[in-house]
Amino acid sequence: MEGESTLGVLSGFVLGALTFQHLNTDSDTEGLLLGEMKGEAKNSITDSQMDSVKVVYTIDIQKYIPCYRLFSFYNSLGEVNEHALKKILSNVKKTVVGWYKFRRHSDQIMTFREQLLHRNLQTHLSSPELVFLLLTPSITTESCCTHCLEHGLYKPQSGLFHKVPLVVTNLGMSDQLGYKTESVSCTSTVFSRAVRTYSSQFFNEDGSLKEVRKINEMYAAIQEELKTICQKVEQSEREVEKLLMDVNRLKEVRKKQQAQAKGAGEKSQNHPQENILLCQALRTFFPESRVLHSCVISLKNRHISHSGCNTDHHLDVVDKLTLMVEYVYSPEASPAPAAPLSKRKALDTQDQWPAKRPRLLESESRPGPAFRGSHQDKASSSSLDIDTEVGSPEDDTDYPRSPTF
């Protein structure tokens, strides 16, 4: 099985020189790293007689070239200034293995500009194995007597920058003689002082938060309230869903009723209903008039057809026909004065009413050919009623009125 790994080696003398130079300046510093890269293949044989080959690339940082001001060989966009870089490197271009930068009171994270500059340096120097050394010193005490230096070696792999193990040696390459390094977070003295001042109000002596029990109780109460509200919301949603179903069902019923009413209206317009009461009345009172029997009238006074109706509707003339109202005279309900009645009788005598009465009786008693039978008796009885209501001129107390149609 074959694998690859990268290891950075930095001597204590070079690291001390870099730190001394940085602490004697008032701003951040940067520069180029010189050295060499070695590749070593290690073959290990396991108990299963299988060979495992591992290639280890060792980047040995031996020297450095400091730049006494920022942006000395690049601009603010991370683009490399070829003329300035060539002037700085002169004859040591082939021994460049990377570049470094000191940042005060900062975290161990590469900025976007540093990433762009690193890729441009790889392209310009034709060295894909170029590394970047980032050193971030910070002050850990208020008296500024203790300093902390964190360092890291970065190399791009698969488009991302990963930390490479860095060994700081003292007198040689032996691991037992190397400096022991420990990564610490960069903390501000002002932040530490503020936390130390107010920590007693929020933390116990063992570092645990105060009022944790009350916070947990409040959290449990909020959860219970939330469960109750969720149940109410679920119930209301079900009620709303039920109401929506009822509304949709009523809408469907309404649509069906409207469709039925529309169909009935169209049917009534196409086949209007005949006014059978009018037809029966015309046959009863005008049996010989063919002009009145020659058309059929609807309930809306419209002509249905111009052919006569020959159907017997079997309606009782007195009880069913609404066009005839039987008149009943009541002397107690409406008494009439004697003088007007006598005057009316005199006028009737002068107008020869008795001479006209036999002619009226003769026309009323003459039955038509279509209504001989059952209607003959009704017509004769009707004429007798009219005759009775008309009466004689000698009757002074009972004067009839004309029949109402």
From Swiss-Prot:
Post-translational modification: Phosphorylation of Ser-402 of the pSXXF motif by ATM or ATR constitutes a specific recognition motif for the BRCT domain of BRCA1.
Coiled coil: 208-262
Subcellular location: Nucleus
A single Gene Ontology CC term: BRCA1-A complex
MPN domain residues: 7-154
Listed PROSITE patterns: MPN (PS50249)
Primary site of residence: nucleus
Domain of life: Eukaryota
Motif pSXXF motif boundaries: 402-405
Region feature Disordered, mapped onto this chain: 333-405
Record's signal peptide: none
Any one of the GO BP annotations: response to ionizing radiation
Keyword DNA repair belongs to the record: yes
Keyword tags: Chromatin regulator, Coiled coil, DNA damage, DNA repair, Nucleus, Phosphoprotein
Acidic residues composition-biased segments: 386-397
Function recorded in the entry: Involved in DNA damage response and double-strand break (DSB) repair. Component of the BRCA1-A complex, acting as a central scaffold protein that assembles the various components of the complex and mediates the recruitment of BRCA1. The BRCA1-A complex specifically recognizes 'Lys-63'-linked ubiquitinated histones H2A and H2AX at DNA lesion sites, leading to target the BRCA1-BARD1 heterodimer to sites of DNA damage at DSBs. This complex also possesses deubiquitinase activity that specifically removes 'Lys-63'-linked ubiquitin on histones H2A and H2AX.
Quaternary assembly: Component of the ARISC complex, at least composed of UIMC1/RAP80, ABRAXAS1, BRCC3/BRCC36, BABAM2 and BABAM1/NBA1. Component of the BRCA1-A complex, at least composed of the BRCA1, BARD1, UIMC1/RAP80, ABRAXAS1, BRCC3/BRCC36, BABAM2 and BABAM1/NBA1. In the complex, interacts directly with UIMC1/RAP80, BRCC3/BRCC36 and BABAM2. Homodimer. Interacts directly (when phosphorylated at Ser-402) with BRCA1. The phosphorylated homodimer can interact directly with two BRCA1 chains, giving rise to a heterotetramer. Binds polyubiquitin.
Protein name: BRCA1-A complex subunit Abraxas 1
The species this protein was found in: Rattus norvegicus
Gene (name only): ABRAXAS1
